[in-house]
UniProtKB/Swiss-Prot annotation:
Keywords: Amino-acid biosynthesis, Arginine biosynthesis, ATP-binding, Cytoplasm, Ligase, Nucleotide-binding. It comes from Acetivibrio thermocellus (strain ATCC 27405 / DSM 1237 / JCM 9322 / NBRC 103400 / NCIMB 10682 / NRRL B-4536 / VPI 7372). It catalyses: L-citrulline + L-aspartate + ATP = 2-(N(omega)-L-arginino)succinate + AMP + diphosphate + H(+). This is Argininosuccinate synthase. SUPFAM superfamilies: Adenine nucleotide alpha hydrolases-like, Argininosuccinate synthetase, C-terminal domain. One of its GO terms (molecular function) is argininosuccinate synthase activity. Its main location: cytoplasm. Homotetramer. It is found in: Cytoplasm. L-aspartate binds at T120, N124, D125.
């Protein structure tokens, strides 16, 4: 008897991936190996081991990817200053390539023929998963059940599961669709699908309090960066994962990091979501303040242009591309002098700069002072203005000459 071919399934233990296990066995006659990734979603994953086996998986890998998530995905994106459409800090976007990468590594280790995922045909995640697989192991077959099977609704899923005695938590469709990791928590669906509806923050928020319920006194936080990477909070050095956890707590208590956005999905439609990113929002604000102090004008302004493209690449699932890697290399060069401490004041959802210092600061009090100085000769400005404004002057003279023609 020939050995069955293997498929690696990105497994969460939810309804979708629970029924995908028997579906793969029935339709492809594969041996199904599940892989659950811990990216800081705050759930105990060990119970999934028994559940996956009972559902029909031959084995399950439970992978702690939190450290890699921060050092290889979050921090490079933070250093780039990448924000999608001016608001979204890419929490789900850069988690998917990491999960898919680990899935590929397991597939190669197990000698699997295929990989599978539970992302729907309407969303961005299917693209992020599959582009990663194509980039890292183009020979692997990719199976996306939601684009193939006859199951069209949650009711169909429940019926399919019950017919096969698959244990599932059956609940009403009264909860938002959520995706959580160390960096953020997203909410979609229900009343949020109408962009005119104000989010019910008392009902939605899990990581933070609504700004109006935050303390009546401000909280000060100091963050130390080394070459663009955060190392300390309030003078205490933390590892990458713990540092974000600490800032999530501080930010959450002060109502920091709510993002309500109607975003353009890669697949062509707009979607509305509410994101909680307390620690990430603080880090982005602090990192920007330090860059303003340490980067020269041309580098800062050009980096802003590059940051937008970087954000698009991450959002579109193009992490493993030459362009993303090249931009990261450029960003790393810009961060050589982004070392120093930033102090922020947090107050009811607001982040206010309260000071910054660095040995690499390009700010010169001698040059910038409004008081008397012996460094800057103000007469030099006249020649500069004449040369800088010369094209404008020539344009105006030409218009004057041709007036009335």
């Amino acid at each position: 008897m020939s050995q069955k071919e293997k498929v690696i399934l990105a497994y969460s233990g939810g309804l979708d991936t629970s029924i995908i296990i028997p579906w793969l066995k029935e339709n492809y006659d594969y041996e199904v190996i599940a892989m659950a990734a811990d990216v800081g979603q705050g759930e105990e994953l060990e119970p999934l081991r028994e559940k996956a086996i009972k559902t029909g998986a031959s084995k399950i890998y439970i992978e702690d990817l939190k450290e890699e998530f921060v050092t290889d995905f979050i921090f490079p994106t933070l250093k780039a200053g990448a924000v999608y459409e001016g608001k979204y800090l890419l929490g789900t976007s850069f988690a998917r390539p990491l999960i898919a990468k680990r899935m590929v590594e397991i597939a190669l280790k197990e000698g699997a023929t295929a990989v599978a995922h539970g992302a729907t045909g309407k969303g961005n995640d299917q693209v992020r998963f599959e582009l990663t697989v194509k980039a890292l192991a183009p020979h692997l077959k990719i199976i996306a059940p939601w684009r193939i099977w006859d199951i069209k609704s949650r009711e169909d899923e429940i019926e399919y599961a019950q017919a096969r005695n698959i244990p599932i938590p059956v609940s009403k469709e009264d909860n938002y669709s959520m995706d959580r990791n160390l960096w953020h928590l997203s909410h979609e669906g229900l009343d949020l699908e109408d962009p005119w509806n104000e989010p019910q923050y008392d009902k939605i928020l899990k990581l933070m309090v609504p700004p109006e319920k935050a303390p009546d006194k401000p909280t000060y936080v100091e963050i130390y960066f080394e070459k663009g990477i955060p190392k300390k909070v309030n003078g205490v050095e933390y590892g990458p994962v713990e540092l974000i956890e600490v800032l999530n707590k501080i930010g959450g208590e002060n109502g920091i990091g709510i993002v309500d956005i109607v975003e353009n999905r890669l697949v062509g439609m707009k979607s509305r979501g509410v994101y909680e990113t307390p620690g990430g929002t603080i880090l982005y604000a602090a990192h920007r303040e330090l860059e303003l102090l340490c980067l020269d004008r041309d580098t800062l302004h050009y980096k802003d242009l590059v940051a937008q493209r970087f954000a698009e690449l991450v959002y579109y699932g193009q992490w493993y591309t030459p362009l993303r890697e090249a931009i990261s290399a450029f960003v790393d060069v810009t961060q050589e002098t982004v070392t120093g401490t930033v102090r922020l004041k947090l107050y009811k959802g607001n982040i206010i700069s309260a000071g910054a210092k660095s040995d690499y600061s390009l700010y010169s009090e001698e040059l910038s002072t409004f008081g008397e100085d012996n460094v800057y000769n103000q007469k030099d400005a006249e020649g500069f203005i004449n040369l800088f404004g010369l094209p404008m002057k020539v344009q105006a003279l030409m218009k004057e000459k041709n007036k009335g023609k």
